[in-house]
Every structure is written in C-alpha cells, then in structure tokens.
C-alpha cells in the first residue's frame, strides 16, 4: 500500500471512532448499506439464496467490523482446544491478498505469497489441515476429499459468507469495539451490532466477563519468548530488550495492540505501523531513520512469514499465546460433541438452502 493510501486509511479509521462530520456526510450511504446487509442475511436465512450444508459442525469466527480483531489467534486456540477434546478440526480461509484458481492446501512450508499470511500462520501453529479459496463451501468440500477424517470445521473470517451454513457463530471485537456504531461507510460496521450470534469474544486484556452478559467472553494475547528471524533457535524474553533502542513494526489490523503489549513488557519502542497484510515486497526498514538507529527490530508472527528472506540479525519475532475464557471453550466443546455423531452419519449435501439454525439473540457490543 502506498503512503497516500495508507494515510487515507488512517484518516477513515480515525473517523469511524467518532460521530463527526465524516459520519454524518456518509450516513445516507450507511443506511443503504445496512438495508442491503439485512436483506442479504434474511435471504440466506429463509432460503432465497442457495447455500451448502456440510456433514459436520461448522464454527465461524468473524467480526461485524472492518479490520483485524484477533481472529487468527482465536482460530489457532480453538483448533488446539478441539484437538485436545479428541476431535479432528480443519480450517478454511479465504486466502486474503492472493489469487487462487482452485482450493489450495496450506502446508507449513508454503509461501505466504501463495496462500496468505494468516492461513500460513494457522497451519504452522495449529497442526491441522488448512485450505484456502474465496468460495469457502467448495474449499471445505475439497478439503474433505483429501482429509476425510476431519469432523469439525473452523471457518476463519467467514461471518458474512452465508453460502456456507454454520452451527456456531463467534463475533469478535477488540478494544475499539464497534467504533461509532454506524454501518459502512459512515462507520466500521459490516452488520449491525445487534446481529444474532452464539457468542461474543472480545480481544482485550482489560475485559472481564460478567454474569450479566453470559455469552460475552474475553481473550488476551500473552507474549512468549522472542526468537531471532535468521536463527529461530535463539530465543530470549521480550523484557530482555528493555533499555535497548527498539523499533516495533506491525502489519496487522490493529498495530497499536502489539505496541501496547511491548510497552507492558517494559519496552519503550519507536513504532512503525504498517497496513494490514503488508506484503514486505519493499523493505520498510531500508532507509527508515528509526530502523537505522535501532539495536533491535521486533515484528509479529504474522509478519514474520513474509520476512524470511530478510538477512538482518536485529529482527526478532514476538509470538503470542491466545488465552480464551474457559467458558467459551467449554460451550463450543459441548455444542460440537453433541453434533459430531450425527455429522459422521450424515452424507455430504450441496445446494441446501437456508442457514442451519436461528442463533440466539446477539449481545450489542457496546
């Protein structure tokens, strides 16, 4: 993304956090977008449009807002939890930023430029089958041919992909929540905050679940030991970089979340926010004064899969461990285990209509 486009994106993102002149100027278009979103969901729910039912439970992790909220680490954590429960999960994702002519399996040795950065990170971290293709229903069916043992599907960032029916929907937010609460383009919402869902997951270390909102859960990302990009066997605690001249760079949906976690570990980094899914085709550190002056450059795991060609011993990767409220993990396990026996005996079917079921009333994330 060029600098002017990046600046425009930053401007719009900032406007989405308030109800200023920009929001009111865009409001007529926002009302139209909201109407289209509601009609589209209603159409799939009531069988106006064709959708596909898979012979297994489908769990969707997505968001009603534009931008990253931590879906990838959530999918990794859920895949690991389902595996520990004795299930055999598979993951289907779009493959953002890559051109695909047919469904493609993501292997730990794949290139991010071929399959996308987030699917590659999931494949490496979760050790489960991961496939990518914009048509998630076709992608899932293709995956089942190659991996017939898969008995539960995780759909990464597929909340609005209604062509694939689902059994359990998780709507994610981060500390920005729903912004100004308005639909695109006046605000960040793809769908209303009141949209029904089975659970709300908030990626914010300061969030605490309460009995008053029983289906709203929290997630935090704990920093692990950093490892050197050129030599992953070299590892040290992030706190070991305190007192050093540090540049932190992040090409994720909310770079400030990464920077804040480093400050919480005792670092005082210079920061380099990059566009989400930045491809690193151009070296952002070359000629950057803060990078030239830095003793250490810290990047995210998501960015690391695109930086493997860089030969710079100053670059260290900061992995995170997602920690999700146990209540949500237990709820998903129960829901999936209750459906797996039926799923095993049910033949695959394409072309069914309607969503699998009505979800319970959603919790407004405000």
Swiss-Prot record:
Catalytic activity: a lipid A disaccharide + ATP = a lipid IVA + ADP + H(+)
GO CC term, one of those recorded: plasma membrane
Membrane spanning residue stretches: none
Domain of life the protein comes from: Bacteria
Biased composition (Basic and acidic residues): 356-366
Enzyme's top EC category: transferase
GO biological process: lipid A biosynthetic process; lipopolysaccharide core region biosynthetic process
E.C. number(s) listed in UniProt: 2.7.1.130
Residues noted as binding ATP in the record, renumbered to the chain: 65-72
Pathway: Glycolipid biosynthesis; lipid IV(A) biosynthesis; lipid IV(A) from (3R)-3-hydroxytetradecanoyl-[acyl-carrier-protein] and UDP-N-acetyl-alpha-D-glucosamine: step 6/6
InterPro entries: LpxK, P-loop_NTPase
GO MF annotation, one: tetraacyldisaccharide 4'-kinase activity
Pfam families: LpxK
Keywords from the UniProt entry: ATP-binding, Kinase, Lipid A biosynthesis, Lipid biosynthesis, Lipid metabolism, Nucleotide-binding, Transferase
Location of region: Disordered: 343-366
Family assignment from sequence similarity: Belongs to the LpxK family.
NCBIfam families per record: lpxK
Role summary: Transfers the gamma-phosphate of ATP to the 4'-position of a tetraacyldisaccharide 1-phosphate intermediate (termed DS-1-P) to form tetraacyldisaccharide 1,4'-bis-phosphate (lipid IVA).
Entries under PANTHER family matching the protein: TETRAACYLDISACCHARIDE 4'-KINASE (PTHR42724), TETRAACYLDISACCHARIDE 4'-KINASE, MITOCHONDRIAL-RELATED (PTHR42724:SF1)
Protein name: Tetraacyldisaccharide 4'-kinase
Gene encoding the protein: lpxK
């Amino acid at each position: 993304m060029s600098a002017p486009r990046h600046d425009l994106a930053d401007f719009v993102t900032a406007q989405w956090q308030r109800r200023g002149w920009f929001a009111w100027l865009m409001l007529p278009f926002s009302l139209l977008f909201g109407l289209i979103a509601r009609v589209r969901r209603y159409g799939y729910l009531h069988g106006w449009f064709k959708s596909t039912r898979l012979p297994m439970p489908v769990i969707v992790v997505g968001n009603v807002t534009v931008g990253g909220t931590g879906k990838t680490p959530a999918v990794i954590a859920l895949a690991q939890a389902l595996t520990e429960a004795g299930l055999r999960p598979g993951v289907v994702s779009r493959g953002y930023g890559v051109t695909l002519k047919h469904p493609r399996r993501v292997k730990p040795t794949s290139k991010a430029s071929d399959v996308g950065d987030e699917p590659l990170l999931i494949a490496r971290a979760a050790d489960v089958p991961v496939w990518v293709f914009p048509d998630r229903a076709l992608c899932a069916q293709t995956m089942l041919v190659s991996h017939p043992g898969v008995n539960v599907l995780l759909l990464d960032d597929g909340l609005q992909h209604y062509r694939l029916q689902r059994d359990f929907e998780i709507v994610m937010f981060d500390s920005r929540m729903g912004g100004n609460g308005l639909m695109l383009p006046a605000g960040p919402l793809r769908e209303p905050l009141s949209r029904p869902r089975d659970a709300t997951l908030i990626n914010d270390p300061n969030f605490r679940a309460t009995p008053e909102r029983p289906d709203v859960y929290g997630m935090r990302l704990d920093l692990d030991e950093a490892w050197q990009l050129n030599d992953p066997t070299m590892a040290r605690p992030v706190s070991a970089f305190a007192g050093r001249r540090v540049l932190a760079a992040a090409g994720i949906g909310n770079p400030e979340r990464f920077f804040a976690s480093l400050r919480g570990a005792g670092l005082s980094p210079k920061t380099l926010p990059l566009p989400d899914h930045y491809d690193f085709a151009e070296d952002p550190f070359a000629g950057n004064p803060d990078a030239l002056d830095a003793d250490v450059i810290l990047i995210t795991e998501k960015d690391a899969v695109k930086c493997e060609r860089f030969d710079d011993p100053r670059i260290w990767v900061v992995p995170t461990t997602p920690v999700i409220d146990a209540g949500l993990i237990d709820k998903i396990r129960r829901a999936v285990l209750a459906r797996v026996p039926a799923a095993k005996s049910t033949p695959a079917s394409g072309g069914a209509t309607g969503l699998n079921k009505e979800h319970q009333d959603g919790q407004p994330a405000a």
